[in-house]
Regions:
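Short amphipathic alpha-helix with an adjacent loop that forms part of the alpha/beta core around
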Residues: 1-4
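Conserved phosphate-binding/catalytic region of the ribokinase-like
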Residues: 30-34, 82-200
C-alpha cells in the first residue's frame, strides 16, 4: 500500500549489502517502477559494509539500472564509472538507465545532468560544524522539489533552481550538530537563498 501511494520510491545500497534485505529492496523498487513511480537511488557507499569493492559495484549497478533519478558523490562517481570527470562520468551513468544524474561535490556544490542540460551549481558559503546529514538533506530537498514536477520538465528542463534549493538545504545542515536535528525548514532554506549565504 505504501508503494502504491508514493510518488517517488527512494532507496540506497546499504539495503543491498546482504540477503534477504537485498532481494526485498530490489523487488520493491521493481514493483514501484511497474506502478509508474519515479525511482530514486543514492548508493551511499560504505566500504566497511561490503566484502569487496567489486561486490559493492555489482549491487550498486543493479540499483542504478532501476533508477530514474540517481545521486552520487564524487567518490562514488569514480568507483562506478572509473572517471572523476563530471561530464564524462555523468554521461556514462545516464547510459545505464537514469534520466537525471546528480553528483554532490561538497563545498563546490553539485553537478546535474538530464537529457538536455548539464551544469555545475555552486553551493552556499558556510562555517561547517558537522557535515553529517548534509547529503541526506540535499537528497530530501531535491526529491521534495521533484515530486510533483511533470516528467517532461524533470528530464528535459532546466533544474538549476531546484539543485540550488537542495544545495542550500545541504549547506544549512552542515552548520549544525547532529543529523536529523540539523535539517533546515523550507523557510530557512528560502531565507538562505535570498541572502546568498548559509549562515542565518
Amino acid at each position: 500500500d505504501l508503494i502504491d501511494q508514493c510518488k517517488i520510491f527512494h532507496f540506497g545500497s546499504v539495503s543491498l549489502t546482504d540477503e534477504p534485505c537485498r532481494s526485498a529492496c530490489l523487488d520493491a523498487a521493481a514493483y514501484a517502477k511497474q506502478q509508474a513511480k519515479r525511482i530514486s537511488f543514492d548508493p551511499n557507499y560504505r566500504p566497511l559494509l561490503w566484502d569487496t569493492e567489486a561486490d559493492a559495484r555489482e549491487q550498486i549497478m543493479r540499483g542504478i539500472a532501476l533508477a530514474d533519478i540517481l545521486k552520487v558523490s564524487e567518490e562514488e562517481l569514480l568507483l562506478i564509472t572509473g572517471t572523476a570527470d563530471l561530464e564524462a562520468g555523468s554521461k556514462i551513468l545516464m547510459e545505464k538507465g537514469p534520466s537525471l544524474v546528480l553528483v554532490t561535490l561538497g563545498e563546490r556544490g553539485a553537478f546535474y545532468r538530464n537529457r538536455t542540460h548539464a551544469q555545475l551549481i555552486p553551493t552556499y558559503p558556510v562555517k561547517a560544524i558537522d557535515t553529517t546529514g548534509s547529503g541526506d538533506a540535499f537528497v530530501g530537498a531535491m526529491l521534495w522539489s521533484l515530486k510533483d514536477l511533470p516528467e517532461e520538465e524533470l528530464f528535459l528542463g532546466d533544474l538549476s533552481q531546484i539543485v540550488d534549493f537542495a544545495n542550500a538545504a545541504g549547506s544549512l545542515t552542515a552548520t549544525r550538530g547532529g543529523a536529523i536535528p540539523a535539517l533546515p525548514s523550507i523557510e530557512e532554506i528560502q531565507v538562505c537563498r535570498q541572502k546568498k549565504i548559509g549562515i542565518l
